[in-house]
Amino acid sequence: MNRVPKGVKKLNFLFEIGLEELPSRYVDEAESNLKKIAEKELKEERIAFSEIESFSTPRRVAIIVKDIAEKQADLDKKSVGPSVEIAYKDGALTKAGEGFIKSQGATPDDVKIIENEKGKYISIEKFIAGKPTKEVLPEILSNVIKKIEFEKSMKWSDRTFRFARPIKWFVTLLGTEVLPFEFEGLKGGNKTRGMRYFAPQDVEISTPDEYVSKLRENSVIARKADRKAEILKSIKENCENDGDVAIINNYLLEEVVNLVEYPFAIKGEFNPDYLDLPEDIITITMETHQRYFPVKDANGRLTNKFIVIRNAPKYSEVVKKGNEKVIEPRLADAKFFFDEDLKGKFADNVEKLKEVTFQKDMGTIYEKMQRSKKI
C-alpha cells in the first residue's frame, strides 16, 4: 500500500504484456514478478497508488495499478559529501569538494556544513519537484519488462531482448488515455486480443475498469482464480448427472488452469477392457500424458470415463471423439509394458538396475542400492 496524498488527482493504470503462449509453469511466476517488480519501481520513483491487481493467462500477464497519482511526490533531498577537511584547503574548495558539488548539479553557494558525531561534512540540500506520472511511467515499464526473469528465455526476430516467449502487443492505458510507450519496436495502445481461436480480433479497452469484462466477452477469463473455479464447476456439472466424481489432482489442476484462457470441461470414455490394469497405471497415464481428470463412480471405483478441459467457450463433439481416440494408444502402451513386466520374475529386474544411471559420476542405481545395503 502506497497511499496517494489528499488533493492529488488519481487514475487507474492498465499495463498488459501480450505474448505467444507461455509454458504453463511460467504463468504464475510471470504474473507474480510483474506485480512485485512494478510495485518496487513505482515506490522508488515516488509514484503513489492504493493497490496493484495482477492477471495472467497463457497469452498475457497484466496489472492494474489502482488510484495511481497523477504526479510523483516532491522530494527534499539531502546529500552528504566529504568532510570539511577534505573538501576545503586554505579556505578554497579542493578537487574532492568541487567533484561532489558538480555531481549534485549544485554550485558552491548551495553548500551547507553539517556536524555529526564523526565531525563536520559538506552537504547539499535540493528540492526536486515531482514530474507528471505519464512522463515517468515509460521508463518504469521498460525496467519492469527487463527485470522479469525466467528459467529459460529466448530471442526472436531481430530483437536483442530476451523473454520466455515473443511479446506481441502492449496495453498501456492511463485512465482513458493511451500512455505513449515503445519497447523493442512495439508500441503501447488500448487494444488487447481475445482468445486466439474464438475471438482473435483486437479488443478495444476504454478504461482499465472494463479490462476483465471486455476480455470475458471475448472468451478470455483474466483471473486465474476465476478460471480454476470455472474448471471445478464444469467438472462437477459433467459428473453429477451420472453420480460420478472426478479425481482432482491439485498439481494437474494448477497446470491445466494455466493452459487455457476459457476452460470448458468435456467428458469422454475409453475401452472398459483397460480397467483390468492397476488403477495407478490408468490414472497416471491420463493425468501425466493427457492432462485428463480420471472419474470414479459413486462407490469409489475407477470408471472408463475421463474429463478433458478444452480451451474454448463451448462443447465440441469433435474434440470429445478426438480425445477418446488419443487415449486408446496411450493405454495400449501402458498395458503392453505392464504385461511385459509380468512375464519375468521380480528379482530379474535387479540386474537391469545396472543399466540405469543414478547420477553422473555416482554410478548406477544398482551400485547405489549396494551402497545403501552397507549403511
Tell what function each PLM region has.
Residues 168, 247-360, 364-370:
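Catalytic nucleotidyl-transfer cores of nucleotide-processing enzymes
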